[in-house]
Amino acid sequence: RTPPARNEPRRPFVYPRLSPEQSARVASSIAGYWAATPDSDWIVQGQNSAWQNKGIGERWHNAWSAAFISWVMCESGLGDPAQFRRAIAHHSYIDQAIVASDTGDERAAYRAYGIGEQRIQPGDLLCRGSRPAYRSLTERRSQLGVGARTHCDIVVKVDEAQEQISVIGGNVRATVRMKVIPATRDDEHPLHPVADNGRPLFAHLQLQAEEIEADALDHAPSLQDKACLVTNLPAIDPLKPSTDC
């Protein structure tokens, strides 16, 4: 990208939209994310109708970022709702982590903390709000159980030297995308994200499990094997997603 000339207004970067062919190729995968999410039948049925009327290249009408997180947790073995409350909206499992932190519930896989309160490790979740735009965990704690538009990403790498945190999330410009968030530290707080593309983060959901290496992502088989970077996906029926959760 060419930087704007001096005094020229900076225009936000716009990610390219998926083509109908790309949307068709990933439709079955996204249907699988929804299948791992309770109470999502109506969403899949509605999308089936859209596909039948407009073709399989029609994009998903409902945001699927929480479904992606739910699918990851299902694949990780967190099938018990007492461990992780898989849901079509992020605020459901955010609230579960807040309650677990407040009550000491040892069954829950995550506990909620404010940004900078605890050290961030791979497997943790970082969350922000848009409606409302929460600026602290306290603000959400006062609205437990109330619907809210939120988004969470999974931490996959913490780079202390470069002061960066890499995260992966779903439905980021209609894709599963990894991004790098700048971070900072001070005498009172460990390394923590500054913001997510200018939007404040309000919650750090800490995974209650043994820590792994902060750079474990670098040694992941999918990154070591260049063949895994090819985007060809197996062709399966997108109208009949299945899951073991």
List each language-model region with its residue ranges.
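N-terminal capping segments
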Residues: R1-P81, P221-C245
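Phenylalanine-focused residue identity feature
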Residues: F13, W60, F68, F84, ...
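Residue-level marker of intrinsically disordered, low-complexity segments enriched
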Residues: S28, D41-W42, V156, S166, ...
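Short regulatory "switch" loops immediately downstream of catalytic or recognition motifs
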Residues: G77-L78, C127-L137, V180-D187
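Repeat-unit-sized solenoid/scaffold elements
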Residues: P81-I88, Y93-A112, E188-I212
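...with weaker cross-activation on analogous glycine-rich loops/strands in unrelated enzymes
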Residues: R85-R173
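Low-complexity, Gly/Ser/Thr/Pro-rich intrinsically disordered linker/tail segments
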Residues: N171-C245
